[in-house]
Amino acid sequence: MQAIIDANLFGEIKNCDLAAVISSNPEAYAIERAQYAGIPVYVVDRSIFPNRLSFTKALLDKLQDLEMELVVYAGFNYILGSQLIKAYENRIINIHPSLIPSFCGPGYYGLRVHEAVLAHGVKVTGATAHFATEIADNGPIILQKAVEILEDDTPRTLQRRVMEQAEWKILPEAISLFCERRLIIDGRRVRIKEEFNDES
């Protein structure tokens, strides 16, 4: 999330107002980061809800109360119910630490992704920014960035490099493209419109 805050601060995310951070974990460090940046914080504590449906409903209610136009999953590893996905169709951006469709879907999150990447001996990994759907890591792909795997990589060193070289770059860029209304969704494909230059 810090990459989004920094990119917004330095004007790299255009036409966007970081209106709120909603955390499902009252102990999340993201809360402190958001407060330090002056971003309003709301907690919808997942642990107090009996099931996914009730948690999803509470989260949807909060998003609608705040009149959010875009939702970004930043470190959010929980598959939400269909009611929120449908209400925000093509308006939820997720970042995944692999080149989808490889090493993605149920069970592939956090360090597990990088462990699987190394176990399979692939030479290149990376990150994918995509629209979230009801199926994990299956939505239209907005941006991808490759990261070379080094001989001495461990899951942790690879995780760090994928974050620094890919995730922290393409997630703010995907948000900016959305806010500039430059994304055209055509089925499973996302096309990016050319940037309009006022000075030309």
Residues covered by each model-derived region:
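One-carbon transfer enzymes
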Residues: M1-S200
